[in-house]
Amino acid sequence: KGELSQYVNPLITVTISDNEVVVSRSSDEKQERAFHGLYRALINNMVVGVSEGYKAELELVGVGYRVSNTGNVMELALGFTHPIFMVLPAEIKVETKTERNKNPLITLESCDKQLLGAVCAKIRSFRKPEPYKGKGVKFVGEVIRRKSGKSAGAK
């Protein structure tokens, strides 16, 4: 599905043997243990990403919230006086779906989990879900903690 590369700190050694990637460290110092776990997870994410790929779905909840894309340029209408145009990196494939009486969906696919998460966070940051009505850009399946709002008759 693609090709990924990663810088590795000199304290950590990465070797490939018998179709297996082995991450090892020279000592048990705290920083080396931390780097060991970090690079093991990053390499695992890269292997899974290149073999299977990653997918993220965002949902636009709110009246008049729309999304459309032409190639890798996404146009978001999120209740502002202007549309938001976002140019996505070439490694990310985007698909938008708008059905009648359903919230618009944005489906992002990539082999790079880190980049995919950063782009999703950027899109979500344009209009985060608010706790009173739940309007905004949220991940599919994300539960928004709701608040009751003004308490009626509380004196």
Language model regions located:
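N-terminal intrinsically disordered, cationic/polar leader segments
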Residues: 1-36, 40-48, 52-121, 125-155
